[in-house]
Regions:
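Short, surface-exposed secondary-structure boundary micro-motifs
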Residues: 63, 69-70, 203, 209, ...
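Bacterial signal peptide processing site
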Residues: 20-22
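Surface-exposed connector loops and short turns at secondary-structure junctions
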Residues: 219-248, 272-296
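Long, amphipathic coiled-coil "stalk"/hairpin helices in large membrane-associated assemblies
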Residues: 25-89, 120-127, 189-193, 220-222, ...
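Surface-exposed patches in structured soluble domains
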Residues: 31-32, 47-53, 57-63, 168-173, ...
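Extended amphipathic alpha-helical segments
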Residues: 24-27, 74-89, 93-95, 102, ...
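C-terminal motif of bacterial Sec signal peptides marking the signal peptidase cleavage site
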Residues: 15-18
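Short, solvent-exposed secondary-structure boundary/capping segments
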Residues: 40, 257-268
Length: 303
C-alpha cells in the first residue's frame, strides 16, 4: 500500500508540475516499458561461460554463454560409432545372390543342352526333368534368399534411422548448450555467473529492446473512439525537476477489454473506474527509461 501511495503521489506531482510549465493537458498518462525477454538455460550442466553484464548491448542471435557439453559430445561419438556398426552389417545384395544366379544360369544352360540331346535321341526325358527341377529349385532358393536379405536390410535401415534420430536429438541438445540472445537489445539484469550449475529453465539474464520504447497509457471509454491503431500522437516524458521532453509516437495496440483503473494512473476523467490500455511506440534517444512516467496528447489531425 505504501508503494502504491508513493506511485500515486509521484504521478500527481509530475502532472501538476507539467501543467505549471505550459505543457499541454495530457489526454492519457502511463509509464514507459520495453519488450523484455528473460533468457533461461535450455540445457543442464556447469555454466562454463556467461559473458554479459548489465548494460551490455547484444545482437539477435549473438552467443554469450556456454553450458558444459562434454557428456553430450561423448554420447554423440558413441552414437556415431553405433551408426558405423549398423552400416557395416548391411549386406551387399548383389554379391550375396551372385552365386545363386550363376548356378541358375548354369542349370538353364544344361537344361537347354539336354533338350537338344533329347531331340536328337541322345538323352532321355528323365534327364530333362531332372534339370528342369534343378532350375526350379534354384529359382525358389533365389527368391527366399532375396526375401531374407531384404528383411535384414530393412531391419538394419530401421536401426540406422533410430540411431540417426538419437544423433539429431543430441545435436539439438548440444546447440541448446550455446546461450544466445533472442533479440537485439540491452542486458537489463543478470541472474547467474560462470561456474554455477544450470538447470533447464533457470533464468540467466534479461534483455530488453530499449531502442524502441512503449508508453502504456490508459484511456476512458469516452476517449476510446478518439484513438485508432496507427494514429500519430505526441508523447511527453518526465525527466524530473519539472523537465519534460516531447517525442513523436504511434499507437500500436489497443486493448479490447476494459480493466479497473490502476492505482498509480490518473485519467482524464478522475471518476472513471474502467479504462482501456493502449501502447504507443516511441523511438528512444537514450533518455527514456523503463518505468518512467509519461503522458500523451492526441494530435487533432487524427481522423
Amino acid at each position: 500500500k505504501r508503494m502504491t501511495k508513493i506511485g500515486i503521489y509521484g504521478m500527481a506531482v509530475w502532472l501538476l508540475s507539467a501543467c505549471g510549465n505550459g505543457t499541454p493537458d495530457y489526454d492519457a498518462t502511463g509509464t514507459f516499458e520495453a519488450t523484455e525477454v528473460i533468457v533461461s538455460a535450455e540445457a543442464a550442466g556447469k555454466l562454463l561461460q556467461l559473458e554479459v553484464e548489465e548494460g551490455t548491448r547484444l545482437k539477435a542471435g549473438e552467443e554469450v554463454g556456454l553450458v558444459d557439453t562434454v557428456q553430450l559430445y561423448l554420447k554423440k561419438l558413441q552414437l556415431e560409432a553405433s551408426m558405423k556398426s549398423v552400416e557395416s552389417q548391411r549386406p551387399d545384395l548383389a554379391k550375396q545372390i551372385a552365386a545363386t544366379k550363376q548356378q541358375i544360369t548354369t542349370a538353364q544352360r544344361e537344361k537347354k543342352r539336354v533338350e537338344n540331346l533329347l531331340a536328337a535321341g541322345a538323352a532321355n526325358q528323365k534327364q530333362l526333368d531332372d534339370w528342369d527341377a534343378q532350375v526350379t529349385l534354384l529359382q525358389r532358393q533365389l527368391i527366399a534368399q532375396e526375401s531374407s536379405l531384404m528383411k535384414s536390410t530393412n531391419s538394419l535401415t530401421e536401426q540406422g534411422n533410430s540411431v540417426s534420430i538419437q544423433v539429431a536429438q543430441v545435436e539439438d541438445q548440444l546447440n541448446k548448450c550455446h546461450i544466445q540472445s533472442p533479440i537485439e537489445g540491452t542486458v537489463l539484469a543478470k541472474y547467474a555467473e560462470a561456474g554455477e550449475l544450470a538447470s533447464v529453465g533457470k533464468p540467466l539474464f534479461k534483455v530488453g529492446e530499449v531502442d524502441r520504447m512503449y508508453l502504456r497509457a490508459y484511456v476512458t471509454s469516452e476517449q476510446l473512439s478518439q484513438v485508432k491503431l496507427g494514429d500519430k500522437v505526441t508523447v511527453y516524458s518526465d525527466y524530473g525537476n519539472s523537465e519534460q521532453k516531447a517525442y513523436p509516437g504511434v499507437v500500436t495496440w489497443i486493448s479490447d477489454r476494459s480493466e479497473f483503473t490502476p492505482k498509480t494512473i490518473l485519467t482524464k476523467n478522475e471518476r472513471a473506474n474502467l479504462v482501456y490500455a493502449v501502447k504507443i511506440a516511441v523511438k528512444n534517444d537514450g533518455s527514456l527509461k523503463i518505468g518512467m512516467y509519461g503522458g500523451v496528447v492526441w494530435k487533432k489531425e487524427n481522423p
